[in-house]
């Protein structure tokens, strides 16, 4: 069973045909399909923006950016359109890794605002709010609109950020990942006798 059995459709008839085919092949179960969500596919560049919120100083650190590598969609998209049409193979979005990314500087302010806005919203709705790392999985459209389509509230499985991101270096003078940022937070909380503020 796939962790995420995504598939794309262009109409209700297409949905019925593809879902029945996947049920017959055992890729998805009918009972799971009945609970599934249907989402609009946003066309643009997909990026994961990784942040860290520290309650100690109530600031949001921007840790870095990466992109998912997915099979078989990524390599399939590298083929010329004519070959794609001739091959007629089923596409899947199975995550197999990550690749580092950056963003043009004129868009950075939008990224920072997204992180700050998310932290404020979570604090308002679910006190005490987000503590530690989170990732805003986003797409940037052709109009440079940033759409967050999913949120990851955990230590991201992308160790490449620790060695490739320039953003922690701008703020702290060195490049590091989420693990070291968590360690820095714990050390500071212990030194200031505020450990209860970062654990639940």
Regions found by a protein language model. Give the residues of each.
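ATP-dependent carboxylate/phosphate-activation module, predominantly the ATP-grasp catalytic core
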Residues: 51-122, 152-183
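Solvent-exposed amphipathic alpha-helical surface segments
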Residues: 121-126, 193
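Hydrophobic "anchor" residues on beta-strands that sit immediately upstream
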Residues: 146
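A generic structural micro-environment signature
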Residues: 15, 44-48, 71, 75, ...
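Cysteine/selenocysteine-centered motifs that mediate thiol-based redox chemistry or coordinate metal-sulfur cofactors
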Residues: 180-200
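Active-site nucleotide/adenylate-binding loops and adjacent lid/helix of ATP-dependent enzymes
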Residues: 1-67, 101-117
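A short glycine-rich, hydrophobically flanked beta-strand micro-motif that places a catalytic Asp/Glu
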Residues: 38-39, 50, 126-143
